[in-house]
Structure formats: C-alpha cells, structure tokens
Amino acid sequence: MATIVQCLSSCATLESQFKVLSLKGISCSSPSSSFSNRRGASATLSSSLSFSQSVSQCVAFSTGNLWVQKPMRQLIVCEAAAPTKKADSAAKRARQAEKRRVYNKSKKSEARTRMKKVLEALEGLKKKTDAQADEIVTVEKLIGEAYSAIDKAVKVKALHKNTGARRKSRLARRKKAVEIHHGWYVPDAAAAAPSEAVPMAA
C-alpha cells in the first residue's frame, strides 16, 4: 500500500513539472534566455522522463486498473511412500492359531500326565501295608517333575496361574495325607486341635 501511494505522489509531481515547463517556454522572448530555458527545461524533462520510466517499471496503469507484479513462488511436492508391510491374511492367522493350539495342548497334556503319575504313585503307596519312609523320596521326584510341567504350562499361558497353583496344592495335600496315614508325618497339636474359645473378661 505504501508503494502505491508513493507512485501516485510521484505522478502528481511529474504533472506539475510539465506545467512549469510549458509556462517557462511561453514567457521567455530573448534568444539567449530562451536557449538557457530550453536547456534547463530539457534537463528537467529528461530527469522527469527518467523518473516516469522508473515508475512505469514498478507500476503499470491500464484502463484504470492497477497491476502489480507478484514474486514467483516455488512449490515442493512430496509423495508419500506406500506402506511396505503386507497385511496379514486370514490363512496366515489360521495357521498361527493352529500352531499355538497344538503347542498349548502339548503343554497341558504334559502337566496332566505328570500329575497322573504322582497321584497313582501316592495311591499305591497309601494302599501298601509294609511301606517304608524312604519310598516317599521317589514320589517327591515325581512331584518335582509335575511342578516343573505345570510352571511351563503357566509360563506359555496354556494354563492360568491360579489353575496351576491349585493343581500344585492338590499334589502337596495328597502327599501329606499319605505321610499322615503311615505315621511319617505328625501335624502339630496346636494346628490339629481346634482353637479354644477365649473367655470374655467379666
């Protein structure tokens, strides 16, 4: 906006200079003065024309419209690359699900087999009349293998952790019951006897 106002004021100054030049040319009568006036007028005219030329380079007037040249702008276009990762297909998901199902089934089956061996050994030891205390060591080894199988099944999430804890507790209770049956383990009297009621103070 400031550039347009400056150009308009320069055009008005140029018009006034043209009027002064025409008046000076009419009033002068002597050859020497007319020559000097013509020389000065030509200098003024040339300076005015040079100014008007510089103005016309900046702003062009055409049929009452003001045209201002805008600077050129460079545009940078970036193309987004397509994703390289291929989407999983339904067939692939089915294969993975089947693979996990077979793996989890094997872990659960192993834990179940180990537990069955422990329970059978404890049942046979309980029915045996002349059982010795050293025979429980073999059962304890089987219990350790069963615990390991249960922990592996829980680790791969084939079994819930609470389910694994219940199964291990079941084996421990069965072992303790056999030891109590043969007299190899005597529970504490305080734990076996019911707790006596504490009399209230009068």
UniProtKB/Swiss-Prot annotation:
Residue ranges of the region described as Disordered: 89-110
Transit peptide (residue range): 1-79
Keywords assigned by UniProt, alphabetized: Chloroplast, Plastid, Ribonucleoprotein, Ribosomal protein, RNA-binding, rRNA-binding, Transit peptide
Disruption phenotype: Embryonic lethality. Embryo development arrested at the globular stage.
Compartment(s) where it occurs, according to its Swiss-Prot or TrEMBL record: Plastid, Chloroplast
Record's subunit section: Part of the 30S ribosomal subunit.
Protein name: Small ribosomal subunit protein bS20c
Organism: Arabidopsis thaliana
